[in-house]
């Protein structure tokens, strides 16, 4: 049985909020643009209790496979590959507990939701505002047909979508307004954990609007077929909007580094942020992994699992913090990379450049004991850090990010392929993510990273064009040691 959520009238026009709800201008990645031109959207509704929302994009559709522009049309269905992806997502989420499932009513999304939801006893809740972006005359066209028929307009859609008007409409701005309305219904629905199954663009808009990011972030936070993104909403006193933390972005059923394109475009340049493995102090509830703390057994396993995952890539250089846990993680990755060329019949030894970067080092002053282990692993834990320490980390992250970007070549020749792996503490990597997205220090608690996780940033337009975030806090490669999608309400002490 399908239950339909009511659709309210459109919300005010485009603007975005920084954490805390104030409207402010922002720039996309490394490009300097002023896009904050309109009144602020209404804030997220206040919450009485914490809520986790898991966003999943539908599996591959027939029009995905054909390279045809879908928009909000409802002619495509899941391919056999798409059905398989949805089944993999079902298995990935099988042990996770959800109180409700919202879905786009379009066939490709609805079918994905049906496969994932499976035998759960509650009804799916279709919401028409969760449909894919409305692309009007572009819908149904193959991409080369769009170029031939619409020329400059199609090029504008590719290069500057937030300012592109199609048939008198601004699709991205309309999408952002729709997403804001969806949050009103999703967050006021009862339950602590909600699954949302929808589409690429609308899921991007949901992530962005929850964090207060404007339309300039369209195509910056990637959503792959059946990729899962997790958002945590924490109630605030005085009826204020909840604080929001992106716990992970685009955790895909398959490896996040196997794809060679980013937002439909190939990318030969990539930075992979690897959070060092766990140490004894981090396992005991401290902001560990600083100074001389070595990896514990869990950290060794995490480092080896990450090294295996990165075998899908040819890593050119590994840049790590000089601290022991980071160096141990880097060494494990380097040894596997260099041995990979000799695993087949033809032995071709490889050399991977490995060097230390002081900017990735975390000072011993950050070794702060938390009240419990749960505090250090929960979303938004950076929000509890002393302001001066946060400020120090933020200043440090600027030079570190620039040093990593400088490792990428500007030219696009055959020799320009470059994969840089940066290894350090989750705290400094949070600063690097915010630098990539050209955000302020206040956004650092809006993201979360776990020990042993990876985050992938692609540069399809080169380092000067800014980064596209393919995924953050990916831990599926850790197998039985991966971080589950939903939080268990039982055995918290054991966790």
From Swiss-Prot:
Optimum pH is 7.0. It catalyses: 2-carboxy-D-arabinitol 1-phosphate + H2O = 2-carboxy-D-arabinitol + phosphate. Pfam families: His_Phos_1. Residues 1-50 form a transit peptide. Residues 1-23 are annotated as: Disordered. Inactivated by oxidized glutathione (GSSG) at pH 8.0. PROSITE patterns: PG_MUTASE. GO terms for molecular function: 2-carboxy-D-arabinitol-1-phosphatase activity; phosphatase activity. Its main location: plastid. CDD domains: HP_PGM_like. Residues 1-12 have a biased composition (Pro residues). GO terms for biological process: dephosphorylation. It comes from the Eukaryota. It is found in: Plastid, Chloroplast stroma. Phosphoglycerate mutase-like protein lacking PGM activity, but having 2-carboxy-D-arabinitol 1-phosphate (CA1P) phosphatase activity. Can dephosphorylate the closely related compounds 2-carboxy-D-arabinitol 1,5-bisphosphate (CABP) and 2-carboxy-D-ribitol-1,5-bisphosphate(CRBP), and 2,3-diphosphoglycerate. Prevents the accumulation of D-glycero-2,3-pentodiulose-1,5-bisphosphate (PDBP) a potent inhibitor of ribulose-1,5-bisphosphate carboxylase (RuBisCO). PDBP is produced during the oxidation of ribulose-1,5-bisphosphate, the substrate of RuBisCO. This is 2-carboxy-D-arabinitol-1-phosphatase. It comes from Triticum aestivum (Wheat).
């Amino acid at each position: 049985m399908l239950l339909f959520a009511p659709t309210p009238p459109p919300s005010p026009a485009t603007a975005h909020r920084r954490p805390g709800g104030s409207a402010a201008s922002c720039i996309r990645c490394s490009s300097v643009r002023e896009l904050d031109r309109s009144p602020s959207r209404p804030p997220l509704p206040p919450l009485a209790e914490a809520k986790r929302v898991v966003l999943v994009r539908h599996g591959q559709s027939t029009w995905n496979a054909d390279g045809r522009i879908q928009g909000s049309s409802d002619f495509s269905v899941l391919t056999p590959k798409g059905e398989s992806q949805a089944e993999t997502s079902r298995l990935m989420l099988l042990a996770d507990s959800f109180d409700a499932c919202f879905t786009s009513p379009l066939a490709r999304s609805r079918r994905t939701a049906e496969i994932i939801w499976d035998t759960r006893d509650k009804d799916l809740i279709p919401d028409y505002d969760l449909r894919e972006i409305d692309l009007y005359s572009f819908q149904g066209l193959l991409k080369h047909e769009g170029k031939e028929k619409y020329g400059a307009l199609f090029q504008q859609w590719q290069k500057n979508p937030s300012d592109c008007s199609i048939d008198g409409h601004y699709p991205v701005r309309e999408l952002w307004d729709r997403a804001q309305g969806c949050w009103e219904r999703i967050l006021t629905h009862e339950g602590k954990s909600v699954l949302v199954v929808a589409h690429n663009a609308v899921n991007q808009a949901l992530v962005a609007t929850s964090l207060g990011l404007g339309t300039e972030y369209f195509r910056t936070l990637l959503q792959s077929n059946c990729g899962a993104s997790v958002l945590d909403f924490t109630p605030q006193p005085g009826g204020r909007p909840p604080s929001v933390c992106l716990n992970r972005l685009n955790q895909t059923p398959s490896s996040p580094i196997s794809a060679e394109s980013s937002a439909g475009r190939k990318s030969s340049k990539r930075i992979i942020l690897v959070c060092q493995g766990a140490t004894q102090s981090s396992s005991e509830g401290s902001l560990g992994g600083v100074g001389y703390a070595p990896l514990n057994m869990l950290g060794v396993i995490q480092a080896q699992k990450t090294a295996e995952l990165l075998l899908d890539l040819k890593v050119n250089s590994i840049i790590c913090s000089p601290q022991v846990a980071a160096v141990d993680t880097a060494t494990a990755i380097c040894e596997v990379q260099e041995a990979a060329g000799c695993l087949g019949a033809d032995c071709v030894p490889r050399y991977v450049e490995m060097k230390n970067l002081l900017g990735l080092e975390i000072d011993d002053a950050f070794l702060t004991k938390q009240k419990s282990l749960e505090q250090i692993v929960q979303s938004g834990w950076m929000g509890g850090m002393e302001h001066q320490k946060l400020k120090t980390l933020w200043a440090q992250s600027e030079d570190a990010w620039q040093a990593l970007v400088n490792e990428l070549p500007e030219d696009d020749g055959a020799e320009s392929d470059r994969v840089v792996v940066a290894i350090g503490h989750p705290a400094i990597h949070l600063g690097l993510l915010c630098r990539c997205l050209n955000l302020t220090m206040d956004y650092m608690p809006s993201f979360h990273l776990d020990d042993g996780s990876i985050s992938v940033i692609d540069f399809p337009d080169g380092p000067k064009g800014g980064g596209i975030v393919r995924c953050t806090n990916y831990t599926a490669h850790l197998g039985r040691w991966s971080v589950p999608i939903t939080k268990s309400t039982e055995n918290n002490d054991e966790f």
